[in-house]
A protein has these predicted regions:
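Acidic, serine/proline-rich low-complexity intrinsically disordered regions
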Residues: 10-16, 20-278
Length: 278
């Protein structure tokens, strides 16, 4: 047994976990996130999946769940959730992850989203679709990541999403930003798109993510490729160090998107004894 190799791998994973824990803490604190960022990793090889299972660091759904429901364990409860595709209940997610082909039943269920069967079929068949179906998907709080996730999902408000996407555009060089939203596939389809194209994505809640995914506060979904996360966070950290705050809308402000007009003469804060004009 290569004990040296195992030790090197352990040290690397330990370092990676520390790095992601730091990024997690920074994002939660500076962006004022309510939901934990979720690292998404797809397992395609049975050997790799069984090796992970054998470590016993995860939980699994007792009953079949939608992708959005399974993610709640990571996003709201801070748990490491392994979702086997055999327990993936949502037909839309099963299609975009390449587990099932588009069926007549799927089209019929979505007729309300179009003007007729032909149009809805075209809509469904044009959704992002992974060519190779994963065996399982791991959903973890970013702080618990061991190595780079495939995609990182943020459930956030308008201005938090604005900062994430703006900083992603800056580090990727992509502009304008063109998100991809598919009918009834906000989180699953949005994640598949980000994975397939190595591109950030932003989606509104669909019926499934709004109800099953508990997004009743009007949250917005942002997906960032795992390979781009470190550069994006580094840019944010540099801005905080240089200006004193993460805000892009009001430079130097600690709140992302402070709702105060720049020239407002009313909302001004000074130390006691300082004159307002100074």
């Amino acid at each position: 047994m290569d004990k040296g190799g195992a030790r090197r791998r352990f040290v690397r994973e330990e370092r990676d976990m520390a790095d992601y824990a730091d990024m997690h803490a920074f994002l939660m604190r500076e962006l004022r996130l309510m939901h934990e960022p979720v690292g998404i990793r797809f397992f395609f090889e049975a050997e790799e999946l069984e090796e992970f299972r054998g470590r016993g660091v995860h939980v699994e759904p007792v009953r079949p769940l939608t992708f959005c429901q399974a993610e709640l364990g990571a996003r709201m409860e801070g748990r490491v959730v392994l979702l086997d595709m055999k327990k993936l209940w949502c037909t839309d997610a099963r299609c975009v992850f390449g587990v099932d082909a588009v069926s007549e039943g799927v089209v019929r269920d979505l007729l309300r989203f179009g003007t007729g069967e032909a149009q809805v079929r075209r809509f469904v068949e044009s959704k992002p679709c992974m060519e190779r179906a994963p065996l399982a998907v791991l959903l973890s709080p970013l702080r618990a990541q061991e190595g780079m996730p495939d995609v990182v999902h943020f459930c956030c408000d308008n201005m938090q999403a604005y900062h994430l996407v703006d900083d992603w555009m800056a580090v990727s060089g992509v502009h304008p930003f063109r998100p991809s939203l598919s009918i009834n596939s906000a989180v699953c389809g949005g994640t598949a798109f980000s994975y397939l194209h190595t591109q950030a994505n932003m989606t509104l809640a669909c019926a499934g993510s709004y109800n099953s995914g508990k997004m009743e506060r009007g949250e917005i979904n942002v997906m960032i490729p795992g390979a781009h996360l470190e550069g994006m966070v580094s840019r944010m950290k540099e801005r905080v160090e240089k200006t004193g705050g993460i805000s892009l809308t009001r430079q130097g402000q600690p709140f992302p998107g402070a709702d105060i007009c720049q020239n407002c003469p009313v909302i001004v804060f000074k130390k006691p004894g300082e004159r307002a004009g100074r």
